[in-house]
Amino acid sequence: MQEWAIDESKVSLVKAGLSSEQGRMNCTFVNDDPLRHGLAEAPDEATEIDERISSAVWTLDAYLAGKPITFLKADVEGMEMPLLRGAEETIKKYKPKMALCVYHYPSDLYEIAEYVRQLVPEYQFRLRQHAPLFGDFVLYCHV
């Protein structure tokens, strides 16, 4: 935290997910994957299951309950659109600067930029590739 000059008193870790609806989400972790990716659905019968967990899922609007934000960074492995749908009121009201990953699905760049522009027409966009290889595109949004 010190490296990024972040005030630790303003950071909290929450064991929950963010999406367009509140509820619970089941994740299955398989031990044949060295990265232990969580899966929303159980893998096929041939895969050895290492762990299953159920986690709370919130909308960002409900979690923040009207508290202001100035910056939103999201690299949530393809769940960027559901996260943004659950943050609609927060984005409209506070117009935070945003750094949104747009490389998980081919349609991400267009759909995410279009959705953000629908919410706040004043948003401007910058696209940056952070890795030397193709991919890892981040869409920066600011008013």
Q: What is each stretch, according to the model?
A:
Residues 1-143:
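Phosphate/nucleotide-binding beta-alpha loop and adjacent structural elements of enzyme active sites
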